[in-house]
Amino acid sequence: MRFCALLFLSVGLCSAAVSTIHVPNGGIQPQVIEKDGIVHLLYFSGAAEKGELFYVRSRDYGATFSTPLAINTPGSAMAIGNIRGAQLAVGRNGRVHVAWNGAAPVGRIPMLYTRLSDAGTAFEPERNLIHDAWGLDGGGSLAADGDGNVYVFWHAPIPGEKGEQNRRVWIARSTDDGKVFEPERLAFDKPIGACGCCGMKAFADASGIHVLFRSADQLVNRDIWLLSSSNHGRTFEGAQVAHWNVGACVMSSEDIAATPNGLLAAWESEKQTYFGRVEAGRIVKPVAAPGEPKNRKYPVVAANAKGETLFAWTEGTAWKKGGSVEWQVFDKNGHPAAQRGTAPGFPVWSLVAAFAKPNGDFVLVW
């Protein structure tokens, strides 16, 4: 439903509408990218400890989806903990790339990667990208650009070390659309650790590569950091985004999304969710989700061509417990618009995803 006065209809000042769709085939943990009129969607299905990943696409912005393509070897992916699942990127010539935490014993969990075949009809057999930096726990991430570069990130201890303080962010890079990856190396060597069971989010575009992750300095400084590279991942600069003094693993996730005016980033801190604009390797003008927070988690952000922003998050989720999904539209000046919504019945272990249509309306997927 649109909430706009008749006075404004003729001049196009009606705010964007928000619709919701459920993940196809009862899946969970959707990851969505809309590019060139195609909505790319992956999801998880099966037992949370050992399940399957599937990919579908839509050419009518979620009204219908294609027949699912299997992504992984059955049982080689996990959904448990919400933040260890698959992530999605679309690179040169629309090729789809996927990376996820493998389902394996702690200490030898692989960072798995696959891509859509040249024919576009199936996914290649998955590959483990870890050579030396074992110790995967919280979810990794990936990004791809239009020049054929693919970047996969994860955090793990320095080889031979243990503990969150000794965790670092690692990068494996491909320059040929994911055909071959270089061995992993440190992306950022500042000794601030990484929150062991927390996720990451990576994004690449013409401005460079950006990565959000949570530190674990002295085990209680679990701050959000933004890493940025302008040289195709050879080096990264880091900036602290938000401080959180907590001596526990908070199992958080982040999001980064492109807009007509640059990038937006979203994160969680002290049981509240925020988003802000990425500028010169920093995040500026953070905005909190409105209202009284009730254990808000798993934020996502999307923006349309009019400069409006959809911000969504979950409320009340916990270990083995679902909750609700909440959302708020913000106008081009960053002020809350009339579109505020909530939906109960958010599934256990799931996530929410969002994208904008060409007409400016938004779609939430959960």
What is each stretch, according to the model?
Residues 4-12:
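Bacterial N-terminal signal peptides
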Residues 16-366:
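Extracellular, repeat-based ectodomains that mediate carbohydrate processing or recognition
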